[in-house]
């Protein structure tokens, strides 16, 4: 995934590594509190809160019961590592891929921003590879949560054409702010991808943070 640089306020292309290990504690942290009950939307909320200020992208799968599986990251800005679908083959009802869109990194962006063509190509491919079982991709950001759901089989060519039309609708225009630009981009992508069977929605949300636990502590 990744590839959101087409409209970014770029101040450089260097990549910075994260020292946070991805281990059982990190996955358990994202599933914290599930004994009281959970859901897919609750899992999305936990993921957003715990990775709100991460400078690199993390990805995971969520099942329909609200459990997070297979957390992954390259630890570098501008790229994402998604575990292969085979990593969750034994998990029942895994239907959602989730990742965060960072802000405040070396690219200068203040907001996470919407889906890229690469994000949407990934979920279209995953939908086809799983016979429709994996059908949703979510991107969390400091401005809110983006969701894209594949309603029918979509080819790579259709994705590229839809992205090209959406990009043409917004490129070269001036915007009053970075956030206004991202809203316009999301609107264009939602319009064009809706025509080929990928439904894109956005829910604006306030910042809400909690800590991702990556190592054992005295109270964990």
Q: Which residues fall in each region the model found?
A:
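Structured interaction and signal-relay segments at domain junctions
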Residues: 69-81
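ATP-dependent kinase catalytic cores of phosphoinositide-metabolizing enzymes
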Residues: 27, 56-57
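Short beta-strand scaffold segments in enzyme catalytic cores
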Residues: 57-64, 137-140
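A short catalytic or substrate-binding loop motif that flags glycine-/basic-rich loops and adjacent residues
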Residues: 51-55
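Extended interaction regions within the primary functional domain
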Residues: 37-41, 70-72, 146-148
């Amino acid at each position: 995934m990744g590839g959101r640089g087409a409209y970014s306020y770029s101040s450089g292309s260097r990549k910075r590594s994260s020292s946070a290990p991805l281990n059982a504690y990190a996955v358990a942290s994202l599933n914290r509190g599930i004994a009281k009950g959970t859901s897919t939307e609750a899992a999305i909320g936990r993921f957003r809160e715990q990775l709100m200020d991460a400078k690199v992208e993390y990805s995971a799968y969520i099942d329909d019961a609200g459990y997070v599986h297979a957390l992954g990251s390259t630890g570098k800005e501008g790229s994402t590592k998604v575990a292969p679908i085979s990593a969750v083959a034994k998990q029942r009802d895994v239907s959602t891929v989730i990742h965060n869109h960072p802000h405040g990194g070396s690219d200068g962006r203040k907001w996470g921003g919407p889906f890229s063509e690469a994000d949407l190509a990934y979920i279209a491919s995953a939908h086809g590879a799983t016979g429709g079982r994996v059908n949703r991709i979510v991107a969390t950001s400091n401005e809110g949560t983006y969701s894209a759901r594949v309603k029918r089989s979509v080819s790579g060519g259709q994705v590229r054409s839809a992205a090209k039309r959406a990009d043409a609708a917004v490129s070269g225009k001036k915007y009053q702010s970075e956030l206004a630009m991202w809203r316009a981009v999301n609107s264009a992508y939602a319009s064009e991808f809706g025509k080929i069977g990928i439904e894109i929605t956005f829910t604006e949300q306030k910042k809400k943070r909690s800590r991702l636990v990556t190592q054992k502590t005295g109270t964990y």
